Amino acid sequence: MRYLRSSLFLFLLLLLVTGLAYPLLTTVLAQWLFPTQANGSLIYRDNAVVGSSLIGQSFSRTGYFQGRPSATSDAPYNALASGGSNLAASNPALDKQIGERAAYWHQAVSNQQPIPAELLTASGSGLDPQISPEAARYQALYVAQARGMSLQQIQQLIDRFTETSKPTFIGQPTVNVLLLNLALDEEKPLP
């Protein structure tokens, strides 16, 4: 009986600590220290949520920058279906996907430069919101023509939204596609 009582006490104590006290403490600290991040890094426009800076979105309309292809199968950028495509480099399905994406970019962008790899291949999560500045510059003329803006204006926006990690030796510069497209809409909305 003594072992049962001490086991039950230990069970209840651990249940309270790990099931109530610790989650409550971490939630309160996160809301106090990092409120934006704790709530999903949501982006608001006109008091409405338009997305998260952590999750990519599909921009299929002409005049918007495109992010990395999504690997989610049922719907593009579905966070509930997050995961890589898991296609091996030798898989013919991967070759087909890359070929279709390359054909799209050759048709959409009259640019003779090589297509950046991240515009052809999905990320590990299939949800990346960022592209490299090079991938953004590859699309710059396409976006400028669709919006009736100068290439220089588009380049300045890309430069303004290029983020580098701190310290700089970790990671590469990136451009958040959602933030860049929102800035484009503020600068010159599509008709």
Swiss-Prot record:
Pfam families, A to Z: KdpC
The keyword Cell membrane appears for this protein: yes
Subcellular location(s) of the protein: Cell inner membrane
Annotated TM spans: 8-28
Keywords: ATP-binding, Cell inner membrane, Cell membrane, Ion transport, Membrane, Nucleotide-binding, Potassium, Potassium transport, Transmembrane, Transmembrane helix, Transport
GO CC terms, sorted: plasma membrane
UniProt cross-references to InterPro entries, sorted A to Z: KdpC (IPR003820)
Signal peptide: none
Membrane topology note: Single-pass membrane protein
Molecular function, one GO term: ATP binding
Main location, first listed in the record: membrane
NCBIfam families: kdpC, PRK00315.1
Family the entry assigns: Belongs to the KdpC family.
Subunit structure: The system is composed of three essential subunits: KdpA, KdpB and KdpC.
Its biological purpose: Part of the high-affinity ATP-driven potassium transport (or Kdp) system, which catalyzes the hydrolysis of ATP coupled with the electrogenic transport of potassium into the cytoplasm. This subunit acts as a catalytic chaperone that increases the ATP-binding affinity of the ATP-hydrolyzing subunit KdpB by the formation of a transient KdpB/KdpC/ATP ternary complex.
HAMAP family assigned to the protein according to its UniProt record, in alphabetical order: KdpC (MF_00276)
PANTHER family, per the entry: POTASSIUM-TRANSPORTING ATPASE C CHAIN (PTHR30042), POTASSIUM-TRANSPORTING ATPASE KDPC SUBUNIT (PTHR30042:SF2)
Stated name of the protein: Potassium-transporting ATPase KdpC subunit
Gene name of this polypeptide: kdpC
